[in-house]
Amino acid sequence: MPKRTFQPNNRRRARKHGFRARMRTRAGRAIIGARRSKGRASLSA
């Protein structure tokens, strides 16, 4: 049987999906903006 694909790791999570990672690209900034306008409690990982 294959191993589980999700191996939680907080550093990897933040580096890939965190706020600063989002702000690095134009598309990421668009995501943050969309989540802000929607009124999300949490903007990113």
UniProtKB/Swiss-Prot annotation:
<keyword id="KW-0687">Ribonucleoprotein</keyword>
<keyword id="KW-0689">Ribosomal protein</keyword>
<dbReference type="GO" id="GO:0005840">
    <property type="term" value="C:ribosome"/>
</dbReference>
<dbReference type="GO" id="GO:1990904">
    <property type="term" value="C:ribonucleoprotein complex"/>
</dbReference>
<dbReference type="InterPro" id="IPR000271">
    <property type="entry name" value="Ribosomal_bL34"/>
</dbReference>
<dbReference type="GO" id="GO:0006412">
    <property type="term" value="P:translation"/>
</dbReference>
<comment type="similarity">
    <text>Belongs to the bacterial ribosomal protein bL34 family.</text>
</comment>
<dbReference type="Pfam" id="PF00468">
    <property type="entry name" value="Ribosomal_L34"/>
</dbReference>
<dbReference type="GO" id="GO:0003735">
    <property type="term" value="F:structural constituent of ribosome"/>
</dbReference>
<protein>
    <recommendedName>
        <fullName>Large ribosomal subunit protein bL34</fullName>
    </recommendedName>
</protein>
<dbReference type="InterPro" id="IPR020939">
    <property type="entry name" value="Ribosomal_bL34_CS"/>
</dbReference>
